[in-house]
Amino acid sequence: QLPIDMAVAHAGPWPVPGGTADDDIYAIYTSGSTGRPKGVQVRHRNVANLIETLRTSPGMGEGDVVLALTTLSFDIAVCELLLPLATGATVWLAGREDAADPDRLRALLSTHRVDVMQATPAAWRMLLDAGWQGDMALRAWCGGEALPADLAAALLPRVGALWNVYGPTETTVGSSRHRASAVDGPVPIGQPLQNTQFHVLDARGTEVPIGVVGELCIGGEGVARGYLGRPELTAGRFIDGGTLGRLYRTGDLGRWRNDGTLECLGRNDFQLKIRGYRIEAGEVEHVLLAHPAVARAVVVGRPAPGGETRLLAYVVPHPGADIEEETLRAHVAQRLPSYMVPQRCLALPTLPLTTSGKIDRNALPAPQDAIVRTSAAAPASGNDMLLDPDEARVAALFRELLALPQVDRDADFFSLGGHSLLAAQLAARLGRALDHQIPMRAVFDHPTIGRLAAWLASRTQDAAAVIPRLGAETPAPLSVMQQ
């Protein structure tokens, strides 16, 4: 509270805090390879440049309705909140459950007549798997991770425009964009935003010709200040490019195409993109090694059905130690966000090595070939060999979505690596198979094959018992008392 005498004594105008375009507007944290997250310092000028480009291309203005799905801890929320505020658009905020439930998401899109929605490829695929037919008035923005060609082909006939947006947090949300058209191969990341330059460099820092692969480095107005309180790390990633100016080394491989657009070819280090979030494999490894039973650990990303990346952890136990998969996943879940919890934690007697003595990540066995000490993924216990038709249907979807050759009847969907997006796909596919709407909540409430199949059977019986509605022209039968 301000004392009255101070307020009276202050006769002049109240001072306005000074600020410049070079001041920080926010700091947002990304995964760090040593287990310590990195705080990216983004300046006002960085965000202003982003807004000035995106308001015209892809485009957003007064009269547009934007559906915001993203948590504030994910930097693309800038496009869902600050960009609409700067352009006069209307923002509808989706709740956490709305964003994870395709049926609720479809209802929001329809009810609010949304013009612009930005989401990760996993979220767009979740909508399509739930039977969403699209909206030709919708401008779909896709970012956070690579846009698979098959997903782009499925979205194009269902939306008015499909934009692929690319850029790391260190260059302020987005650095390039591309309006997708006919898909005949990898979807390019397009051309740089205004006042932004892309350079494809070789190991010596020299620009490579068109078509040659190199590291994508970004310069211009989008480049952030650096990492908060991490001068050495800042110096390693934000470099002096000489005549090219100050550059950020993305760690992504890419090349220029003959049509003047850029193509991103993935990482050249151990960073991964999981459900739109960029993570350092080393951060997850650091947490695993803190478990008393773990002697060595390595974390990798492997392709999963639907174009997603599945996070797998391989561990070597200390001599005499017993490792259970569920215990390791719980250990990580207590210390890291849910998207950084490995879908599988697999025990090996040793880690494969290259001739130079480094871990050979390409030689790590597929999950079904590894030694797994866990009750949830133990060998089939006999009762899964006697599945009824309902259980067999659920079991087949468990195996497909989790990319597992065998799933026990009593194994928990989420202990085996399931997450909310996969749960939404499971509910949608079961709903199509049974011709009933299956809420995603059912998977959380009944996460095993046996329990979910029993719930589905009871729901089907309840649906069959519903009295059919008669048309207005059909006479209703009289009850005994009425007769």
Set out the residue ranges of the language-model regions:
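AMP-dependent adenylate-forming
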Residues: 1-18, 47, 161-164, 179-385, ...
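Motif- and composition-driven signal specific to adenylation
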Residues: 11-210, 215-224, 242-248, 271-272, ...
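Regions immediately C-terminal to embedded phosphopantetheine-bearing carrier domains
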Residues: 14-18, 24, 141, 338, ...
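PAS/PAS-like sensory domain cap-loop motif
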Residues: 36, 59-61, 229-231, 404-405
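Short, conserved phosphate/pyrophosphate- and ester-handling motifs at nucleotide-, phospho-/glycolipid
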Residues: 120, 220, 252, 419, ...
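Short acidic/glycine-enriched loop/turn segments that link adjacent beta-strands
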Residues: 170, 305-309, 446
